[in-house]
């Protein structure tokens, strides 16, 4: 995906293992919009510890020149991921990033009905509720239906969504 030099975009960066939270804190200090999906788990002493869901991956929303300045001059310890096909910085489309964030932020457990059964891998759109507008594929796990959203073809997030909220595309 190609963007203009001064257009905001989501860039994909890699931080060293275990430094994701530090990179997040530095980006917050600089006032840069970013996203690192995390979860809270119990550490070995029973304390709650925040850990990244996707090891080493950081998403930074910035212009291309500002993104490069962050790494070279602002002290953000990360390297950008390059798209192998275009040999340019990897960029995530805004819609895909928004869908991915919304699905990670919310999971619903209610049930509902559709006019016909869903099949595995079928493309659906959520038509109501907090995930309205999100598009993804249907996955069934232990008898429950989930909407699965893919980011860059290799990162996946899922949320249980009532069947009545889904529209088959």
Regions inferred by a protein language model and the residue ranges of each:
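Glycine-centered loop/turn positions within well-structured domains
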Residues: 145
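Acidic-enriched and Gly/Ser
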Residues: 1-123, 139, 148-169
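Short coil-to-beta-strand transition motifs
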Residues: 120, 127-134
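Short beta-strand-centered aromatic/proline hotspots
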Residues: 133-141
């Amino acid at each position: 995906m190609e963007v203009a030099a001064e257009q905001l975009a989501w860039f994909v960066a890699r931080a060293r293992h275990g430094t994701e939270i530090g990179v997040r804190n530095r980006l917050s200090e600089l006032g840069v919009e970013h996203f690192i999906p995390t979860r809270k788990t119990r550490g070995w002493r029973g304390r709650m510890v925040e850990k990244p869901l996707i090891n080493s991956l950081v998403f930074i929303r910035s212009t291309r020149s500002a993104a490069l300045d962050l790494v070279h001059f602002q002290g953000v310890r990360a390297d950008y991921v390059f798209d192998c096909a275009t040999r340019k910085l990897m960029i995530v489309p805004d819609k895909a990033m928004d869908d991915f964030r919304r699905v990670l932020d919310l999971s619903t457990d209610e049930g509902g009905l559709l006019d016909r059964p869903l099949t595995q891998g079928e493309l659906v759109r959520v038509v109501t509720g907090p995930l309205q507008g999100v598009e993804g594929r249907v996955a069934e796990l232990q008898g429950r239906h989930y909407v699965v959203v893919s980011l860059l073809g290799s990162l996946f997030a899922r949320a249980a969504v009532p069947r009545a909220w889904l529209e088959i595309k």
